[in-house]
């Protein structure tokens, strides 16, 4: 299994986690207290499930191909963002991160 520590090498990354299909935390690295990591894993799993459903609906209504299965999602706040690909989620500081580098690192880990 690929190491989540690779994500912490991306400038601006503050923490990352991997979750199981039921939403339980598999592992976490960085500045994420265990109780926050547990909640974040549940949130990431729930959001991923919702995005899969949204992608299915969008593909069905639009007739466009290539939307399913959805692979990931992102949510941006004022200072921090959350990026998810597969069952890996990374938390970053917006003012420091290169989103291109983050996506490359997430892709390497998620597609191994």
Task: List each language-model region with its residue ranges.
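Non-catalytic interaction/Regulatory regions outside core domains
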Residues: 1-112
């Amino acid at each position: 299994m690929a190491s989540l520590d690779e994500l912490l090498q991306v400038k601006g990354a503050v923490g990352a986690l991997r979750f199981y299909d039921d939403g339980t935390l598999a592992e976490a690295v960085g500045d994420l207290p265990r109780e926050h990591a547990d909640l974040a894993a549940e949130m990431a799993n729930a959001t991923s499930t919702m995005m899969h459903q949204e992608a299915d609906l969008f593909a069905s209504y639009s007739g466009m191909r290539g939307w399913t299965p959805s692979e990931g999602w992102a949510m941006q706040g004022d200072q921090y963002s959350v990026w998810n690909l597969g069952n890996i989620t990374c938390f970053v500081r917006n003012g420091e991160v290169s989103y291109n580098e983050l996506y490359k690192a997430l892709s390497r880990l998620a597609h191994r």
